[in-house]
């Protein structure tokens, strides 16, 4: 069984509530998405491997801890994933970035891949997949399956909110992939949207219809 990490810090929950409002402007929605993802990054990377190195301060030589190995790859599921990518890169600016282009067929709700670009040494890195919503789970399942073909050291999935159906779908296909989210909402509607949700994250981030 996979693990769902619910990040319920007061700042995260406050900002998520502001995002949910239907009268939130594109600018406000985008800013809040970045702020929430930045705050969530602390918890997502809590168990990242560390190593000790020797450094020199203005007063003496000492040791300190830094992130070990070749670090991270943030993988954005296009297009909405880019809306929370910047917030995470604010915290880890040295991370590599990959992109998976997926669109949801409006009739079948099946994820269709149209783009895939990753660092060449993905097998030496830890991957954090980012997408604002884990709804039907079809895109997440397809993205993780594709990434596993490259053999990364580990994979985590980060979203602003999800629902029981999305959690169940990703857990059934990839029980080894932990999910980090700010909320688990009630359910999906007949069109595959999360209720009460935040609407179409991509449209609200980019100001499109």
UniProtKB/Swiss-Prot annotation:
Can you supply a Gene Ontology BP term from the record? UMP salvage
Q: In which pathway does it act?
A: Pyrimidine metabolism; UMP biosynthesis via salvage pathway; UMP from uracil: step 1/1
Q: How is the cofactor bound?
A: Binds 1 Mg(2+) ion per subunit. The magnesium is bound as Mg-PRPP.
Summarizing the function annotation, the protein's role is: Catalyzes the conversion of uracil and 5-phospho-alpha-D-ribose 1-diphosphate (PRPP) to UMP and diphosphate.
Q: What is this protein called?
A: Uracil phosphoribosyltransferase
Please name every pair of cysteines joined by a disulfide bond in this record: none
Enzyme class at the top of the EC tree:
transferase
Gene, per the UniProt record: upp
Q: What is the scientific name of the source organism?
A: Rhodococcus opacus (strain B4)
């Amino acid at each position: 069984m996979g693990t769902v990490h619910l990040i319920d810090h007061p700042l995260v929950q406050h900002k998520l509530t502001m995002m949910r409002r239907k009268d939130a402007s594109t600018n406000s929605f985008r800013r809040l998405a970045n702020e929430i993802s930045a705050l969530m990054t602390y918890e997502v990377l809590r168990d990242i491997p560390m190593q000790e190195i020797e450094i020199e301060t203005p007063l003496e030589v000492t040791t300190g801890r830094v992130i070990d190995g070749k670090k991270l790859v943030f993988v954005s599921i296009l297009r909405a994933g880019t809306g929370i990518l910047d917030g995470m890169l604010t915290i880890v600016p040295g991370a590599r970035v990959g992109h998976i282009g997926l669109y949801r067929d409006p009739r079948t709700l099946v994820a269709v891949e149209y783009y895939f670009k990753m660092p060449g040494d993905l097998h030496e890195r830890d991957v954090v997949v980012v997408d604002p919503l884990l709804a039907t789970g079809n895109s997440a399942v397809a993205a993780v399956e594709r990434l596993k073909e490259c053999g990364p050291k580990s994979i985590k999935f980060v979203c602003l909110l999800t629902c029981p159906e999305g959690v169940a779908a990703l857990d059934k296909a990839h029980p080894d992939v932990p999910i980090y989210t700010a909320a688990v909402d009630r359910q999906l509607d007949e069109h595959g949207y999360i209720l009460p949700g935040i609407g179409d994250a991509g449209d609200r981030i980019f100001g499109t219809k």
